[in-house]
Protein backbone atom coordinates (compact mmCIF):
# COMPACT_ATOMS: atom_id res chain seq x y z
CA UNK A 1 0.00 0.00 0.00
CA UNK A 2 2.84 2.37 0.85
CA UNK A 3 4.58 1.58 -2.44
CA UNK A 4 1.44 2.47 -4.40
CA UNK A 5 1.15 5.74 -2.46
CA UNK A 6 4.79 6.70 -2.92
CA UNK A 7 5.28 5.49 -6.49
CA UNK A 8 1.93 5.26 -8.29
CA UNK A 9 3.75 5.40 -11.62
CA UNK A 10 5.00 1.83 -11.11
CA UNK A 11 1.81 0.33 -9.65
CA UNK A 12 -0.95 -0.30 -12.17
CA UNK A 13 -3.25 -2.21 -9.81
CA UNK A 14 -3.02 -3.16 -6.15
CA UNK A 15 -4.28 -6.20 -4.26
CA UNK A 16 -4.43 -6.13 -0.47
CA UNK A 17 -5.15 -9.36 1.38
CA UNK A 18 -6.93 -9.09 4.72
CA UNK A 19 -5.41 -5.96 6.16
CA UNK A 20 -6.88 -2.48 6.35
CA UNK A 21 -4.98 0.80 5.95
CA UNK A 22 -5.08 1.71 9.62
CA UNK A 23 -2.83 1.30 12.64
CA UNK A 24 -3.18 -2.08 14.34
CA UNK A 25 -0.94 -1.69 17.36
CA UNK A 26 -0.28 -4.98 19.12
CA UNK A 27 -2.50 -7.54 17.41
CA UNK A 28 -1.53 -10.50 19.56
CA UNK A 29 1.33 -11.86 17.50
CA UNK A 30 3.41 -12.51 20.61
CA UNK A 31 2.55 -16.21 20.50
CA UNK A 32 3.79 -16.39 16.92
CA UNK A 33 7.05 -14.64 17.80
CA UNK A 34 7.53 -16.88 20.84
CA UNK A 35 7.03 -19.97 18.70
CA UNK A 36 9.41 -18.76 15.99
CA UNK A 37 12.11 -17.86 18.50
CA UNK A 38 11.62 -21.23 20.23
CA UNK A 39 12.27 -22.97 16.91
CA UNK A 40 15.31 -20.77 16.41
CA UNK A 41 16.68 -21.77 19.84
CA UNK A 42 15.95 -25.50 19.41
CA UNK A 43 17.64 -25.69 15.99
CA UNK A 44 15.44 -28.45 14.52
CA UNK A 45 16.57 -30.06 11.29
CA UNK A 46 13.15 -30.79 9.80
CA UNK A 47 9.61 -29.43 9.66
CA UNK A 48 8.50 -32.49 11.63
CA UNK A 49 10.83 -31.45 14.45
CA UNK A 50 9.83 -27.77 14.24
CA UNK A 51 6.06 -28.37 14.23
CA UNK A 52 5.60 -29.40 17.90
CA UNK A 53 7.85 -26.54 19.02
CA UNK A 54 5.64 -24.02 17.21
CA UNK A 55 2.47 -25.76 18.41
CA UNK A 56 3.51 -25.26 22.04
CA UNK A 57 3.20 -21.49 21.55
CA UNK A 58 0.68 -21.12 18.70
CA UNK A 59 -2.80 -22.53 19.37
CA UNK A 60 -4.13 -22.29 15.81
CA UNK A 61 -2.92 -25.28 13.71
CA UNK A 62 -3.41 -23.33 10.47
CA UNK A 63 -0.98 -20.65 11.66
CA UNK A 64 1.53 -23.34 12.67
CA UNK A 65 1.27 -24.83 9.16
CA UNK A 66 1.61 -21.41 7.56
CA UNK A 67 4.76 -20.62 9.56
CA UNK A 68 6.23 -24.02 8.67
CA UNK A 69 6.02 -23.10 4.98
CA UNK A 70 8.85 -20.64 5.65
CA UNK A 71 10.92 -23.08 7.72
CA UNK A 72 14.44 -23.44 6.33
CA UNK A 73 16.89 -25.44 8.49
CA UNK A 74 19.91 -24.08 6.60
CA UNK A 75 18.94 -20.43 7.20
CA UNK A 76 20.67 -18.61 10.09
CA UNK A 77 17.31 -18.03 11.82
CA UNK A 78 15.62 -21.20 10.49
CA UNK A 79 13.10 -19.26 8.45
CA UNK A 80 13.05 -17.63 5.01
CA UNK A 81 12.51 -14.24 6.60
CA UNK A 82 14.54 -12.12 8.98
CA UNK A 83 12.85 -12.98 12.27
CA UNK A 84 14.96 -10.62 14.36
CA UNK A 85 14.28 -7.67 12.04
CA UNK A 86 10.53 -8.37 12.05
CA UNK A 87 10.47 -8.58 15.84
CA UNK A 88 12.61 -5.47 16.34
CA UNK A 89 10.49 -3.43 13.90
CA UNK A 90 7.09 -4.85 14.80
CA UNK A 91 5.70 -1.56 16.14
CA UNK A 92 6.76 0.28 12.98
CA UNK A 93 5.26 -2.44 10.79
CA UNK A 94 1.94 -2.28 12.62
CA UNK A 95 1.74 1.53 12.57
CA UNK A 96 0.00 3.36 9.75
CA UNK A 97 -0.20 6.89 8.42
CA UNK A 98 -3.04 7.61 6.03
CA UNK A 99 -2.17 7.70 2.33
CA UNK A 100 -3.86 8.61 -0.92
CA UNK A 101 -3.84 5.88 -3.57
CA UNK A 102 -5.72 6.31 -6.83
CA UNK A 103 -4.84 3.03 -8.58
CA UNK A 104 -7.56 0.38 -8.76
CA UNK A 105 -7.29 -1.64 -5.55
CA UNK A 106 -8.87 -4.90 -4.50
CA UNK A 107 -9.20 -5.67 -0.79
CA UNK A 108 -9.69 -9.39 -0.16
CA UNK A 109 -11.05 -10.22 3.29
CA UNK A 110 -11.41 -13.50 5.17
CA UNK A 111 -15.05 -13.75 6.27
CA UNK A 112 -14.11 -14.73 9.83
CA UNK A 113 -11.14 -12.38 10.12
CA UNK A 114 -11.13 -9.42 12.51
CA UNK A 115 -8.63 -7.46 10.40
CA UNK A 116 -11.07 -5.62 8.11
CA UNK A 117 -14.25 -4.60 9.90
CA UNK A 118 -17.39 -3.09 8.36
CA UNK A 119 -16.66 0.22 10.10
CA UNK A 120 -13.29 0.38 8.26
CA UNK A 121 -14.98 0.86 4.86
CA UNK A 122 -15.17 4.64 5.08
CA UNK A 123 -11.51 5.00 6.02
CA UNK A 124 -10.48 2.60 3.26
CA UNK A 125 -12.43 4.54 0.62
CA UNK A 126 -11.01 7.86 1.84
CA UNK A 127 -7.50 6.57 1.15
CA UNK A 128 -8.32 4.25 -1.78
CA UNK A 129 -11.21 5.84 -3.71
CA UNK A 130 -10.91 3.25 -6.51
CA UNK A 131 -11.17 0.30 -4.13
CA UNK A 132 -13.41 -2.71 -4.37
CA UNK A 133 -13.64 -5.55 -1.91
CA UNK A 134 -14.32 -9.25 -1.88
CA UNK A 135 -15.02 -11.41 1.16
CA UNK A 136 -14.17 -15.10 1.17
CA UNK A 137 -16.38 -16.81 3.71
CA UNK A 138 -15.29 -19.69 5.92
CA UNK A 139 -11.76 -18.49 6.58
CA UNK A 140 -9.88 -16.12 8.82
CA UNK A 141 -6.92 -13.80 8.44
CA UNK A 142 -4.78 -16.41 6.68
CA UNK A 143 -7.27 -16.43 3.79
CA UNK A 144 -4.52 -17.01 1.20
CA UNK A 145 -3.44 -20.19 3.04
CA UNK A 146 -6.94 -21.39 3.95
CA UNK A 147 -8.69 -20.84 0.60
CA UNK A 148 -5.97 -20.28 -2.02
CA UNK A 149 -8.17 -21.24 -4.97
CA UNK A 150 -10.73 -18.57 -4.10
CA UNK A 151 -8.00 -15.97 -3.58
CA UNK A 152 -6.38 -16.79 -6.92
CA UNK A 153 -9.73 -16.63 -8.71
CA UNK A 154 -10.52 -13.22 -7.18
CA UNK A 155 -7.09 -11.89 -8.12
CA UNK A 156 -7.34 -13.19 -11.69
CA UNK A 157 -10.76 -11.61 -12.22
CA UNK A 158 -9.56 -8.29 -10.80
CA UNK A 159 -6.37 -8.21 -12.86
CA UNK A 160 -7.94 -9.41 -16.10
CA UNK A 161 -11.20 -7.49 -16.07
CA UNK A 162 -10.71 -4.74 -13.49
CA UNK A 163 -14.03 -5.65 -11.97
CA UNK A 164 -15.21 -6.16 -8.46
CA UNK A 165 -15.25 -9.92 -8.03
Model-flagged regions — what are they?
Residues 1-45:
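Flexible "cap/lid" loop of the alpha/beta hydrolase fold
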Residues 5-9, 126, 153, 157:
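Short, well-ordered alpha-helices that flank and scaffold nucleotide-derived cofactor binding pockets
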Residues 15, 47-53, 94, 108, ...:
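A hydrolase-biased, glycine/serine/histidine/acidic-enriched motif that marks catalytic-domain neighborhoods
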Residues 19, 110, 138:
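Cofactor-binding loop segments of dinucleotide-utilizing enzymes, especially the Rossmann-like FAD-
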Residues 27, 42-99:
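Conserved alpha/beta-hydrolase catalytic His-Asp/Glu region
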Residues 75-127, 132-135:
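Conserved serine/cysteine hydrolase catalytic core
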Residues 131-165:
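Catalytic active-site module of serine/aspartate enzymes centered on a nucleophile-bearing elbow/loop
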Amino acid sequence: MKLAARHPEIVEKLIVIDIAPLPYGNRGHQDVFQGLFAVNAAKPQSRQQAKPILAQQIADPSIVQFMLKSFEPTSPEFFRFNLTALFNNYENLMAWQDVSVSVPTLFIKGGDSPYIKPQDSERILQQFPNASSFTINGCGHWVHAEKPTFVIRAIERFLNKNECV
